[in-house]
A protein has these predicted regions:
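Interfacial loop-to-helix junctions that mark the boundaries of transmembrane helices
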Residues: 2-8, 29-40, 152-164, 202-204, ...
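Alpha-helical transmembrane segments and, especially, the helix-loop junctions at the ends
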Residues: 90-100, 117-151, 173, 308-318, ...
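Membrane-embedded alpha-helical segments and adjacent helix-loop junctions characteristic
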Residues: 27, 31-117, 258-260, 264-326
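Membrane-interface alpha-helices at helix entry/exit sites of multi-pass transporters
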Residues: 73-81, 112-124, 151-162, 327-338, ...
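Alpha-helical transmembrane segments
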Residues: 36-48, 156-174, 329-344
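Hydrophobic mid-bilayer segments of alpha-helices in multi-pass membrane transport proteins
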Residues: 2-25, 36-49, 207-217, 226-244, ...
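Juxtamembrane and boundary regions of transmembrane helices in multi-pass small-molecule transporters
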Residues: 45, 155-202, 349-397
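Long, contiguous bundles of hydrophobic transmembrane helices that form the permeation core
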Residues: 169-247
Length: 397
C-alpha cells in the first residue's frame, strides 16, 4: 500500500464513521465533540508543520551539535545532554516529537562518541513518557483533559501538574543513572554498525536563524494563557510563508501527521460511542464507591496505568475520564495514562515511533529490557507522582 493510500484509507473510514455518529447522536453531543477535538487537531497539525520545517532548516541538528561539545560529547556528560534534549523536547513539543526527533539525534551522538546506544535510547523513551505531564501540549491526553473544562486555564493545570511531573522526572533520571551508569563509558571500538543519521557538519540553511527565532518565541508562549493553537498556528504561518518564498519543494501534505490524527479522532469517537451505550455510568459508579479522596487518586492512576498497557493510553484515558470529577482526580488519571505506559510496546504511540527510529538506524529493539525495566519504573513514577499530587497545597480536591 503506497503512502498516499495509507493516508486516504484511514481518513475515508473515519469520515464515514463520523457521518454515522453525527446522524445517530444528539446534536448537542456532536457539536460538543467537534468543539473539543477541533483545537486539539489544529494544534497537532500546526505544531507538526513547525517542527518538520525546523528540521528541514537544520535547527535541531545544530542544537544537538552545540549541546554535545567538549566534555559533554561522551561519558556522563553525554547522558546529561540526552536528558536535557529529551526533557525540553517532551515538555514543549510533545512526547511523540521526542520519539521521532530526539531518538535519531541521540543515536548519532552515541555513535560519534563510541557509546552503546541502547542505554541512551531507553532513557529517551522513558523521559518521553514520564516527562509528558508538565504542560498541556506535552501529551495529547493532557490536551483532552484541558478541554474538559475542569481546569481553570493553563496556569491552573501547570500548578497541579508541576509537583507530580517533577517527582516523575526525578524518579526516571535516578533510575536511568543507577541502571546504566556503568554502561555510559565509550567503547574504543565505537559503534560501527550504526548508520550515521544525525548531526552532520554542513552549510547553514538560509532559514535556519528564522526557524530558531520562531521556535524560541513559540516555546514560552505555550506556557501562557494564550490558546496553544493560536501560538502554533501563527508560528506555522510564518514558516510556511518563508519556505514558500525560498523553497516550495518542502511544502507538501506530509508535513501534517494525517494518519495519527485520524487514529486519535477515531479512538475518541469510538470511546464516546461506547460510553453512550452505558459504560460511562458503570465507570462513574465503580469509582464513586471509593471512600477517600486519596484512594480515588491512587485508584484512577493505577487503573490508567494498567489499562494503558493492556490497550493504549489514549483509549484508556478516555474510557476512565468520566470517573474524574475534579481537576485533581483528572490529574491523577493523567499520571497513570502518561507515566504508566512504559511496559508494553503498544501502550504508547511514542514508544512505537521510538522503536521505528531504532529499526531505521539498524538497531534491534530491546523489548525484553524495555519490559523488565519498565515495570519497576512505571510503579515508581506513578506511585511517587500520585503521592506528590496528594500534597499539592491550596487546590481543589
Amino acid at each position: 500500500m503506497g503512502a498516499p493510500l495509507r493516508t486516504v484509507v484511514p481518513w475515508t473510514i473515519l469520515v464515514g464513521f463520523l457521518i454515522a455518529y453525527a446522524l445517530f447522536s444528539p446534536r448537542a453531543q456532536t457539536i460538543g465533540l467537534i468543539g473539543r477535538l477541533g483545537p486539539i487537531m489544529l494544534f497537532l497539525a500546526t505544531i507538526s508543520i513547525v517542527i518538520n520545517l525546523a528540521v528541514v532548516a537544520g535547527l535541531f541538528h545544530r542544537v544537538a551539535e552545540f549541546a554535545a561539545t567538549g566534555r559533554a560529547a561522551s561519558g556522563p556528560g553525554l547522558w546529561v545532554v540526552v536528558v536535557l534534549l529529551a526533557a525540553v523536547s517532551t515538555t514543549f513539543l510533545s512526547l511523540d516529537t521526542t520519539a521521532v526527533l530526539v531518538t535519531p539525534l541521540v543515536l548519532a551522538l552515541a555513535r560519534r562518541a563510541g557509546h552503546d546506544p541502547i542505554p541512551l535510547a531507553l532513557t529517551v523513551v522513558w523521559i518521553a513518557n514520564t516527562g509528558s505531564l508538565i504542560l498541556p501540549v506535552s501529551n495529547l491526553t493532557n490536551l483532552m483533559a484541558v478541554e474538559t473544562g475542569l481546569f481553570d486555564g493553563t496556569g491552573h493545570y501547570i500548578r497541579l501538574a508541576a509537583l507530580p511531573a517533577t517527582a516523575s522526572l526525578v524518579v526516571t533520571l535516578g533510575f536511568s543513572w543507577v541502571v546504566f551508569r556503568r554502561r555510559l563509558q565509550p567503547s574504543p571500538q565505537g559503534q560501527p554498525g550504526l548508520r550515521n543519521t544525525g548531526p552532520q557538519k554542513s552549510a547553514a540553511h538560509p532559514l535556519l536563524h528564522l526557524s530558531g527565532c520562531v521556535v524560541a518565541v513559540l516555546l514560552p508562549l505555550l506556557t501562557t494563557s494564550i490558546p496553544f493553537w493560536w501560538s502554533t498556528s501563527a508560528a506555522a504561518i510564518i514558516l510556511v510563508t518563508a519556505f514558500a518564498l525560498t523553497d516550495r519543494s518542502v511544502l507538501h501534505p506530509k508535513l501534517v501527521p494525517w494518519t495519527a490524527m485520524a487514529v486519535a479522532v477515531g479512538l475518541t469517537v469510538a470511546v464516546q460511542v461506547v460510553h453512550s451505550l452505558g459504560l460511562e455510568g458503570l465507570v462513574r459508579t465503580g469509582f464513586a464507591q471509593l471512600e477517600t479522596a486519596e484512594g480515588l487518586l491512587f485508584a484512577l492512576a493505577a487503573a490508567g496505568a494498567v489499562l494503558s498497557n493492556l490497550i493504549n493510553n489514549i483509549p484508556a484515558y478516555l474510557l476512565l475520564e468520566p470517573a474524574a470529577d475534579s481537576s485533581l482526580a483528572l490529574t491523577a488519571l493523567l499520571i497513570g495514562s502518561n507515566f504508566g505506559p512504559i511496559v508494553t510496546p503498544w501502550a504508547s504511540l511514542a514508544t512505537l515511533l521510538w522503536a521505528d527510529q531504532l529499526r531505521r538506524a539498524g538497531l534491534g529493539v530491546p523489548w525484553r529490557q524495555f519490559i523488565l525495566l519498565g515495570i519497576p519504573l512505571a510503579v515508581g513514577t506513578v506511585g511517587m507522582s500520585v503521592t506528590a499530587l496528594a500534597f499539592v497545597p491550596g487546590l481543589d480536591r
